[in-house]
């Protein structure tokens, strides 16, 4: 009897312990989420515009204090949270998914602290104030699911605070780089136009129109004075250093990637991939030569001849483009085509409802890119997303406009729409907004996000989009070569003394970019250290993941299941993808 009783007691004890473990993990997981929510509450009080960008509308009537004293409080909040996190949450007690969330949260805090201690954007980046001046109001009218009357009232409240933002800019800015200041000047012209006219178009029919006009008029006047300050006082002394330097670049890239790769390893990978893509482009261009240059002999196939062949064929392909005013319409048509193809070919299940709208990029957001995707904010997922495309800037001459349109010709628009829209950013960000983890919805990996978008460009053509059109494939390779070159350019511009002329030569001769596109890319490289490297690093992570999973599963590999397994965890650092995708695929459908 005693033996039987002891055995049964052990069995009961083991069952109780087995049940207790998940309960304890659930409690620890809930504690982590509570700590993160508390962090966000304090963060949003300090950073109202960041709250709006993420979709928390409790502080939509406020804007940040941008004084040096206020920014010290931001850093103190980060340091305090980083110190308290391991004391308040037991990492060992968390479930594995929550452990990943813990690591993401902790890494983000460390990265934020390093950036605050080692960079000086509020003293050196003139553009940063444009975000408060423009996005503080624009986002309320375009990406909030609150009633229109509430959004307009919050706009009016924020507009009253814009003079304080301008005053802070005038106080804080000291010898910023010239390229940052020139972009800010162009964007501020757009901001003036927005407050003089555009804001009323975005606000639509509202009983608050008179109050909105009364609030916008002094803002436009304030910004005109700010424009004079930028042009006449700041620009003549805008001789600050934009290069990050090798040591800071390496550290910042390590924090940005969070993938266990050094800056030197990333650029070495990029240089090897660059050579491979060059060879592939020549193979395609050779097959297209007779289509565009009938009866003309193929150039010699030495290095110079190969590059000349590719350049000539790309030049011929580029002639097939729309007019400037047709860019937005053309992208809308491509969105419809892509969605139909994705559904018909079982690429993945498209999220419903679709919150994405194709719009013309506002003038005050132009200057760095041709298109961007602004998804519904993660904390307001039912708001509208915007796929914005930029027509050529109004101050460009006819030659530069034509160069821009040739760069974004009909074939390149296909690739751009895949990348920014379907199944690229728009689809991925909609999936992310459905993730149950608050930490993953808010703290997103740019490497994952850009890598997914670049991965989809080749994948869609591999699955038959474009019906094997070689001109489209050559355009896709050119677009991908740009992503690879971004990494090389990013590294060389910030870690060496590469001149603008040398960068222009590299982009135009080796990367086959038009002069207009190349000059924009040089400006962007100066203004966004390390971000340009995320495209290639992320793409290689997604590509290698696909290779490994497909080899492991063999004939059981299903493309749709794989894609949805990649999207399911949210935009996590890519080092977690293999573990998470395997776990997802092991579960029944």
Cite the ranges covered by each PLM segment:
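N-terminal maturation segment of proteins
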Residues: 25-589
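N-terminal secretory signal peptides that target proteins for export/translocation
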Residues: 1-7
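Bacterial N-terminal signal peptides
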Residues: 8-20
